[in-house]
């Protein structure tokens, strides 16, 4: 049982080791304040190991298959005790470790511009990332995050910094068996920091004002096992102090 994920996980001693063949291509560019980076990749994974949620009906079918195998190997064995109570998982979702060949294809990129402003540096950037993961015999790999668009503004000056980031996360409807979809959301975060000399300049205090999920969106991380029960934190505003001496 794994209480943190709400799963009753069933292992398999016959699982093989994964074998992966990967290709990654990365490009970088920077000139006169303009910058860009891009990566494309493909991962070909043989015997990819994953955790698959299953319904009680599917579990009963698996139990019957294993039960029949046990009868073949143990003729005459009394079968009343072997499976009694095995359908009681304490309210946890039953999950089996499975194995299939899979392909992961995707890309990520960021481009932007930096300018000098009021004795400091301000940068504007836009980025996007995306992964498409499918099994070679059909169907999607579970718990794969959807496409994201990321917009950010950063400013830095000696002893001072500020940032504003908006992440537009798309819905995820490319689902594995018994997997639930997640809706799109916008996550807006802000942070402002000021460094203050202390102890006659021998130390430093960093004061940071931050605000996360300013729009107070109901957001769910698709790769989380508990996304349906536990969304990401709502609006969160705080003040943080860090001292160095």
Model segments located where?
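Outer-membrane beta-barrel transmembrane strands
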Residues: 16-30, 35, 100-105, 142, ...
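Surface-exposed extracellular loop regions of Gram-negative outer-membrane beta-barrel proteins
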Residues: 1-22, 40-66, 71-89, 167-177, ...
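Outer-membrane beta-barrel channels and translocator barrels
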Residues: 20, 30-34, 114-119, 156-160, ...
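Outer-membrane beta-barrel domain signature
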Residues: 12-16, 96-100, 136-142, 177-181, ...
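Residues on the lipid-exposed face of transmembrane beta-strands in outer-membrane beta-barrel proteins
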Residues: 25-29, 107-113, 151-155, 164, ...
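Outer-membrane beta-barrel "beta-signal"
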Residues: 33, 232-245
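Gram-negative outer-membrane beta-barrel transporters
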Residues: 41-45, 56, 62-63, 68, ...
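Transmembrane beta-barrel architecture of outer-membrane proteins
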Residues: 10, 20-24, 95-97, 102-110, ...
């Amino acid at each position: 049982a794994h209480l943190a994920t709400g799963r009753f996980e069933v292992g398999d001693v016959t699982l093989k080791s994964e074998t992966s063949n990967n290709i990654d291509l990365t490009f970088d560019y920077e000139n006169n304040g303009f910058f860009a980076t891009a990566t494309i990749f493909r991962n070909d994974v043989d015997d990819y190991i994953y955790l698959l949620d299953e319904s009680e009906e599917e579990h009963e079918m698996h139990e019957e298959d294993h039960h029949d195998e046990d009868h073949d190997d143990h003729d005459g064995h009394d079968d009343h005790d072997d499976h009694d109570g095995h359908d009681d998982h304490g309210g946890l979702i039953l999950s089996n470790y499975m194995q299939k060949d899979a392909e992961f294809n995707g890309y990520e990129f960021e481009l932007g511009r930096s300018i000098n402003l009021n004795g400091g540096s301000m940068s504007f950037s836009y980025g996007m990332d995306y992964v498409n993961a499918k099994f070679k015999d059909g169907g999607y790999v579970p718990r794969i995050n959807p496409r994201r668009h990321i917009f950010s503004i950063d400013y830095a000056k000696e002893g001072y910094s500020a940032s504003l980031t908006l992440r537009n996360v798309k819905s995820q409807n490319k689902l594995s068996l018994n997997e639930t979809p997640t809706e799109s959301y916008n996550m807006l975060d802000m942070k402002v920091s000021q460094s203050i000399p202390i102890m006659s300049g021998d130390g430093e205090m960093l004061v940071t004002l931050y605000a996360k999920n300013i729009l107070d969106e109901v957001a769910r991380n698709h790769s989380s096992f508990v996304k349906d029960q536990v969304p990401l934190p709502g609006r969160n505003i705080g003040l943080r102090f860090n001292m160095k001496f």
